[in-house]
Amino acid sequence: MSIEFSKYQGLGNDFILIDNRSSHTPLVSPEQAIKMCDRHFGIGADGVIFVLPGTANTDYTMRIFNSDGSEPQMCGNGIRCLARFIAHLEGGETLGKTYQIDTLAGVISPRLEAQGQVKVDMGTPYLLAKEIPTTLGNSNDKVINHSLEVAGQTWLVTCVSMGNPHCITFVKDVWGIDLPTLGPQFEHHPGFPERTNTEFIEVVRRDYVKMRVWERGAGITLACGTGACASVVAGVLTNQCDRYCIVELPGGNLTIEWSEMDNRIYMTGPAELVFTGIYNL
């Protein structure tokens, strides 16, 4: 069996996009997704994204399998890629066009902007420990600058969910962090029953930060959209960032705004088609 695909990337966070509008069930299994994402023996990607029929009042449904076969609730860079892929499927891009996308994290609304940019209404952040979820602190409290022991060190962490869990810690130098060693230990820390994404943040100015990320189920990636959103929220909660902030990632920059008007987070960044092809399953 063969399947058509398109590969997109958002700041180097790359995905295999599949037109799954004919079925409510992904056309590829998690095991097959692992093989497709393999950078030596497959197409190579951080995950596989499926465009399924919409439900209720949504236009489409988004499902994702990570490169390890796990299924996250949402992916910020991925949904920007999804929006441009949908525009291609519909016959072309219309600036200002907004899609209502059903995800496991709720309904997300990406809007097509000029020069390949996509602005996404990421919804409101979840801040209580039980919503992350994490067992750090009291379940009905926010987790802000909480002490966490990892790799023989004490880290001050702030936890935020964007529909998926994030653990954010602020450091002096993001490039001085041993991410391959620390990332897995944060991800699998017993304080996070569903594992966690982990962001290391260096504040350059209140409106500009640098970020490196270890993604749950994907490891080190060049960018993470939900992580950038969660990190700005953490920066505001710890009084280190403004609500409008540029996040510099290894793959490029994202513009994040946590609106005081409606408490929603807006993420703007690029998404680009890399190539299309046919894969033999």
From Swiss-Prot:
Protein's recorded name: Diaminopimelate epimerase
GO annotation, cellular component aspect: cytosol
Catalytic site positions: 75 (proton donor), 224 (proton acceptor)
Pfam families for the chain: DAP_epimerase
UniProt keyword annotations, A-Z: Amino-acid biosynthesis, Cytoplasm, Isomerase, Lysine biosynthesis
EC supergroup of this enzyme: isomerase
Family matches, as HAMAP family: DAP_epimerase
EC number: 5.1.1.7
Stated family: Belongs to the diaminopimelate epimerase family.
Site, Could be important to modulate the pK values of the two catalytic cysteine residues: residue positions: 166, 215
Organism: Rippkaea orientalis (strain PCC 8801 / RF-1)
Keyword Cytoplasm attached: yes
Taxonomic classification: Bacteria, Bacillati, Cyanobacteriota, Cyanophyceae, Oscillatoriophycideae
Pathway: Amino-acid biosynthesis; L-lysine biosynthesis via DAP pathway; DL-2,6-diaminopimelate from LL-2,6-diaminopimelate: step 1/1
Location (main, coarse): cytoplasm
Annotated substrate binding sites: 13, 66, 76-77, 164, 197, 215-216, 225-226
Compartments it resides in: Cytoplasm
Stated role: Catalyzes the stereoinversion of LL-2,6-diaminopimelate (L,L-DAP) to meso-diaminopimelate (meso-DAP), a precursor of L-lysine and an essential component of the bacterial peptidoglycan.
One GO process term, biological-process aspect: lysine biosynthetic process via diaminopimelate
NCBIfam families registered for this protein in UniProt: DapF
Gene Ontology molecular functions: diaminopimelate epimerase activity
Catalytic activity as recorded in UniProt: (2S,6S)-2,6-diaminopimelate = meso-2,6-diaminopimelate
